């Protein structure tokens, strides 16, 4: 599924080059948006594959996948309703917000934390999908119990590693994780601005 989706995105990625022949095109913003859409799509596919591995019914898998992606899309509004200032619960729920990292790319900023987040979601969901499929291959026996324990511990380690990686990347300074690729460098401080700020004596 990802291969088919990637082929579609690759074809779509040609459009900025075609439009460039007819005028000025912000190439950085265009391709960052395409990258964000590809990562978001791959994460959504990973969600659907994981849910499909939990049930043998295609209808149930489709309904649950749609519900999960819809809730994820609405998670930003849900967290604002719970607490506008933010608390521990909203921080935990924000981990399930697939759309917020996508929105970070829309202004032409290459957000490394968002890329790591999407790759983590894709990797952990694919891992859980494989674990779910492998679990069905074992019949109820003593060997199954030992395998289940191994899988549970392996899953816990994978989840913990995913959380640690995202926390480490999130703790990095924004100047190293956010790259301004906008056409007019909207999010960068120019040399003229730096010179003007050096002459300021009062707080702005």
Give short role names for the model-derived ranges.
Residues 4, 8, 41, 118, ...:
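Hydrophobic alpha-helical membrane-embedded or membrane-associated segments
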